[in-house]
Amino acid sequence: MEVVIVPDAADAAALVADTIGALLEREPEPVLGLATGSSPLAVYDELAARYERGEVSFANARAFMLDEYVGLPADHPERYRTVIEREFAGRVDFAPGAVQGPDGTAEDVAAACAAYEQAITASGGVDLQILGIGTDGHIAFNEPGSSLASRTRIKTLTEQTRRDNARFFGGDVDAVPTHCLTQGLATIMAAKHIVLLASGRGKAEAIHHLVEGAVSAMWPATILQHHPHVSVLVDPAAASRLQLADYYRQTYAAKPDWQGL
């Protein structure tokens, strides 16, 4: 696991966009994993800006979303498929149908989850997965207590997550769905490269557990310690509880530019 402490979200976005740009050039049919929430927004803005300048193209790429609310109507503005289209996919040149997500409207939830797992496998797997992290250490909607071997499934959201997400629903916690479909921790771990973004002091405890704590289902993100290629990009506030912060700064400063993330 590599920890990169950056001045702010813009610096993190530039690093991630560089990495994705290199992937788009290197792979004939690259597969991205897309997260929602506030953490990746600066990355999506940077990628859209580079697309507008003709620096990157997603025409040959595919993408898979991490999760989706259950029960929101298809036209709801906070349905994650709508959010991804608005914040990123609709601003670049993905081919029609190239961006897929779990079907939160499916009547047969188990079948929908199995089909989504199969679609990811059939694509050849995710080359680069973007992640955020919850204040309680959840990634995607794998809440504390989630099985470290879990696959795509339906989950009940914790009250903490619903409170955290209420800002997207006009501050109304009751408007936040109680259930979701989410990629499991084992599904996420199958990605070849994972890039996790976090900013703000509110994420400091979760980042401390992720990087320096014991692997535990109570802090689901800690499973990433077992992945061979994880990049954790954090601002100074999110890094404020890291005991080895100076070491992480030193090792990244000494890293050759050609190596990238």
Swiss-Prot record:
Pfam families: Glucosamine_iso. PROSITE patterns: GLC_GALNAC_ISOMERASE. InterPro entries: Glc/Gal-6P_isomerase (IPR006148), Glucosamine6P_isomerase (IPR004547), Glucosamine6P_isomerase_CS (IPR018321), NagB/RpiA_transferase-like (IPR037171). GO terms for cellular component: cytoplasm. The active site is at D67, D136, H138, E143. Coiled coil: none annotated. SUPFAM superfamilies: NagB/RpiA/CoA transferase-like. One of its GO terms (biological process) is glucosamine catabolic process. Its EC number is 3.5.99.6. Pathway: Amino-sugar metabolism; N-acetylneuraminate degradation; D-fructose 6-phosphate from N-acetylneuraminate: step 5/5. It catalyses: alpha-D-glucosamine 6-phosphate + H2O = beta-D-fructose 6-phosphate + NH4(+). Keywords: Carbohydrate metabolism, Hydrolase. Belongs to the glucosamine/galactosamine-6-phosphate isomerase family. NagB subfamily. Catalyzes the reversible isomerization-deamination of glucosamine 6-phosphate (GlcN6P) to form fructose 6-phosphate (Fru6P) and ammonium ion. This is Glucosamine-6-phosphate deaminase. It comes from Beutenbergia cavernae (strain ATCC BAA-8 / DSM 12333 / CCUG 43141 / JCM 11478 / NBRC 16432 / NCIMB 13614 / HKI 0122).
